[in-house]
């Protein structure tokens, strides 16, 4: 069973998600009211996961990315003010989170700073913006902000409820910019705001690589680095664990789907492994 570890309890991320969707009965107390609200939020999250605004390619990755349980774990609600860091041209999480919060909160996409010398980057930015502009009924008015790893403010300090980053930490480590980026996240969040992090999990039987050259990051190192930036660890979720991932590939984590950096070489073998073993953690700004 895939588990989510909280600071004081161990519970099943998928089981808790299913329980909320089922609207399990409890005694009529304040806890019941809270449970009902959480169940309603989770139901709305799942409606966005199942919604017609999502592309077929993104849906095909759900078995690896488990968007419903991850959002329930992060506790993103329709009223949340969410900043997603580097959502990518496909907008996997954009397709879910932007519709979820468009009426009661906001979704801001922190996208790469344009660079005319990088035509592929410029194409990706244009495709992402075109995707949003093509369906305002689903996505609402999504704001974008240019993001770089130099530690500049992303939004007005203290204005975000959530900063979410999926599979990005290794890039900032490789550039020697992780500390600056985490400091910017800390400034962006209000007191009590949450930082949600997903990253390819490195092996603990090998030395930590501060440059994350293979794309994998040791979980213990990531947690320590984020805590050093002023965050308090809240919980971890194991819904995206993958025991098939041996993390010893010729082209690092990019050997696996969806990248397949080796192209057709041993493609069936890597497809059978699936997407990487990943940790999912949440931290609060005190």
Model-predicted regions and their roles:
Residues 82, 163-164:
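Hydrophobic beta-strand segment of the Class I
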Residues 153-163:
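A short acidic, Gly/Pro-enriched loop at the edge of an enzyme's catalytic core
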Residues 149, 171-184:
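A short, conserved alpha-helix within the catalytic core of class I
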Residues 98-99, 178-191:
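A short glycine-rich, Lys/Arg-flanked "PGG" loop and its adjoining helix->strand segment in the class I
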Residues 268-286:
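C-terminal lobe and adjacent flexible extensions of AdoMet/dcAdoMet transferase-like proteins
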Residues 78-89:
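Conserved class I S-adenosyl-L-methionine
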Residues 44-73, 77-78, 96:
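Class I SAM-dependent methyltransferase Rossmann-like catalytic core
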Residues 107-110, 192-200:
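Conserved beta-strand signature within the Rossmann-like core of class I S-adenosyl-L-methionine
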């Amino acid at each position: 069973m895939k588990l989510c570890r909280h600071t004081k309890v161990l519970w099943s991320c998928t089981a808790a998600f299913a329980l909320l969707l089922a609207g399990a009965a409890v005694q009529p107390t304040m806890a019941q009211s809270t449970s009902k609200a959480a169940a309603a939020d989770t139901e709305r999250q799942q409606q966005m996961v199942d919604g017609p605004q999502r592309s077929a390619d993104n849906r095909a990755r759900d078995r690896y990315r488990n968007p419903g349980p991850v959002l329930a774990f992060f506790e993103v609600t329709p009223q949340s003010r969410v900043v997603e860091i580097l959502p990518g041209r496909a907008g996997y999480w954009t397709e879910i989170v932007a519709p979820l919060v468009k009426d009661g909160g906001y979704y801001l996409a922190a996208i790469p700073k344009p660079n005319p010398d990088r035509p592929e980057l410029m194409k990706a930015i244009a495709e992402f913006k075109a995707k949003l502009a093509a369906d305002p009924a689903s996505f609402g008015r999504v704001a974008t902000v240019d993001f770089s790893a130099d530690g500049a403010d992303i939004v007005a300090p203290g204005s975000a409820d959530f900063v979410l980053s999926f599979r990005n930490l290794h890039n900032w480590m490789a550039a020697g910019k992780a500390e600056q980026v985490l400091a910017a996240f800390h400034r962006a969040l209000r007191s009590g705001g949450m930082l949600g992090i997903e990253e390819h999990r490195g092996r603990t039987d090998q030395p930590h690589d501060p440059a994350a050259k293979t794309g994998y990051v040791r979980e213990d190192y990531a947690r320590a680095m984020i805590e050093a930036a002023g965050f308090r660890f809240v919980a971890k979720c194991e819904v995206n664990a993958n025991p098939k991932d041996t993390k010893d590939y010729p082209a690092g984590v990019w050997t696996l789907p969806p990248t397949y950096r080796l192209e057709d070489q041993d493609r069936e073998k890597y497809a059978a492994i699936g997407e990487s073993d990943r940790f999912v953690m949440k931290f609060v700004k005190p």
